[in-house]
Structures are given as structure tokens and as C-alpha cells.
Amino acid sequence: MGLPGSKALGGGLYELRDMGRGAGYRVYYTWVGDMIIILLAAGDKGSQERDIDLARRRLADLPDAP
């Protein structure tokens, strides 16, 4: 189950978008058990590809990564 405004990006990575405010900032996160782990609070659409790559690297570094 995700959060409102969230999108599954695969491999246990999720993107939460700012719904209708400002520049559309994003937060990338994962679930470990019943905890949400914030991997990256990031910029707007212009940096999205780089931000997702960084979030995926951080996810891979988690000891209990999904």
C-alpha cells in the first residue's frame, strides 16, 4: 500500500510528488517492514532522472533493502 500521490518505480522504490503546490518537488522512499525510509528529498522534473538514479543507489546500500 502506498501513500496518496505516490508512484511505484519498481524494485521497492517509490516516488511521492508534491500534489499541486510549487515546482513539483519529489521525495523518494522505500518500505522496510513497517517503516518508511526516506532515500532522497529532491528537486523538480528537471532533475528527476538523476534523482531516481541516486535514490536507487541509496536503496541498494540499505542492509535490509527490499
What are these language model-derived features?
Residues M1-R21:
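A short, surface-exposed loop/turn module that caps and links secondary-structure elements
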Residues R17-P66:
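Enriched for short, Lys/Arg-rich terminal
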